[in-house]
A protein has these predicted regions:
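Acidic/glycine-enriched connector segments
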Residues: 1-211
Length: 211
């Protein structure tokens, strides 16, 4: 269990959703969930994380939130719109909806009870998820400033944990946008998900690791 210290790292997280099935370009297949979860837990411990800020889509978000809450870290969740709507569009719309739906309900319940659920009013906007990315970064910065005011000196480390394959899908790739926002805000971009890559080689190897 991670110790909860006021001077620990603030981690903002972004990453891939679980793959649709079938998919031509594997990025995050379900058979990697357990391993990625263990690696995220290890990264949070080694970073001395005390707060995780992210969204709650099926895939990296929910895996990280589940791991962080098991470690009794504070988890602040940012959704682009109301949780009930987000659950439909970004959680149970992929394979194994029961698995992801129950995990979503659990982590959202904890965040809501602690006053750490942020539901934006961006439903219907083309940039709803980009807006959520910006708020995730902003919330992490705010928490860092609050911790700094409680301390005599020093600053809390701001880490952007990005769990993805490293290959942009194009201009609408929200993970790539998250990376850019984190860099512009001077977060330490600590980890990348060098995952399933593209094409036949990816289908054959299925290697997903945090590097």
């Amino acid at each position: 269990m991670a110790s909860i210290q006021s001077d620990g790292a603030i981690v903002a997280l972004g990453g891939r959703r679980i793959d649709a099935e079938p998919t031509l370009t594997p990025r995050f297949p379900f058979d990697q969930v357990s391993r990625v979860g263990m690696e995220i837990s290890d990264r949070l411990r080694r970073s001395y994380a005390v707060v995780l800020v992210c969204s709650a889509a099926c895939g990296v978000d929910l895996i990280a939130l589940n791991a962080a809450q098991k470690m009794r870290l504070r988890t602040r969740i940012v959704l682009p719109f109301l949780a009930v709507r987000f659950r439909e569009t970004s959680v149970v719309d992929r394979p194994r909806p029961e698995f992801w739906g129950s995990m979503f309900d659990r982590v959202i319940g904890v965040a809501r009870a602690n006053g750490d659920l942020v539901e934006l009013n961006a439903d219907g906007r083309d940039n709803a998820y980009s807006t959520a990315n910006a708020v995730i970064i902003d919330e992490a910065l705010k928490i860092g400033r609050c911790q700094q005011r409680r301390r005599a000196s020093g600053t809390s480390p701001l880490i952007a944990l990005v769990v993805w394959d490293g290959a942009s899908r194009g201009a609408d790739d929200n993970t790539k946008k998250f990376v850019k926002l984190a860099q512009e805000s001077r977060f330490r971009l600590e980890n990348n998900y060098k995952g399933c890559g593209n094409g036949a080689r990816a289908i054959k190897r299925r290697e997903c690791r945090l590097q």
